[in-house]
A protein has these predicted regions:
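Alpha-helical transmembrane segments of multi-pass membrane proteins
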Residues: 13-21, 61, 86-98
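Juxtamembrane boundary at the C-terminal end of a transmembrane helix
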Residues: 124-133
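Core segments of transmembrane alpha-helices
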Residues: 52-71, 115-123
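Transmembrane helix-loop-helix
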Residues: 65-89
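Interfacial loop-to-transmembrane junctions
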Residues: 96-118
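Cytosolic, membrane-interface loops and tails of multi-pass inner-membrane proteins
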Residues: 17-50, 97-101
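Alpha-helical transmembrane segments
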Residues: 2-15
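Helix-boundary and loop/linker segments of multi-pass membrane transporters
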Residues: 1-3, 39-43, 76-80
Length: 133
């Protein structure tokens, strides 16, 4: 794999992060907050619905950041084993981090985004290690 592909994949992963975390979240940005449910649907039936919103956003984000690697893998007919691990691991981390920011108020936006960037870099480095050896 040449350096152009390597850098392009990282840039596309970062771009996918920006698109998904800022432009595609829409209603989920509100729905992943407990306080939104308490205000708009105070019935006990909806008490934990914010968890599903966190899950949906984290799944979308995890899939989006992996799309450049997925496309590369399909074009070059290489194993998708990383896909089966990266999506659930990134999903869990992303959901926990967003919950810490949106509901627990333990971290701010800078820490939230820094952790997401680290997730992307680690996923990219693992991709390089697997596919460039």
């Amino acid at each position: 794999m040449n350096i152009t592909w390597i850098i392009a994949i990282l840039i596309l992963m970062l771009f996918a992060h920006i698109v998904d975390d800022y432009y595609l979240q829409g209603w989920l940005a509100s729905a992943k907050q407990k306080k939104w449910w308490e205000k708009n649907a105070p019935d006990k039936l909806y008490k934990f619905d914010y968890i599903m919103a966190l899950f949906c956003h984290a799944l979308s984000w995890s899939t989006m950041i992996f799309l450049p690697i997925l496309v590369y893998s399909l074009i070059n007919n290489v194993s998708l084993n990383l896909f089966y691990l990266a999506i659930p691991i990134n999903l869990i981390i992303h959901a926990i981090v967003d919950d810490l920011k949106a509901n627990k108020f333990k971290i701010n936006l800078i820490v939230d985004q820094s952790i997401h960037f680290i997730q992307i870099i680690i996923t990219w480095v693992i991709f390089l290690f697997i596919y460039c050896n």
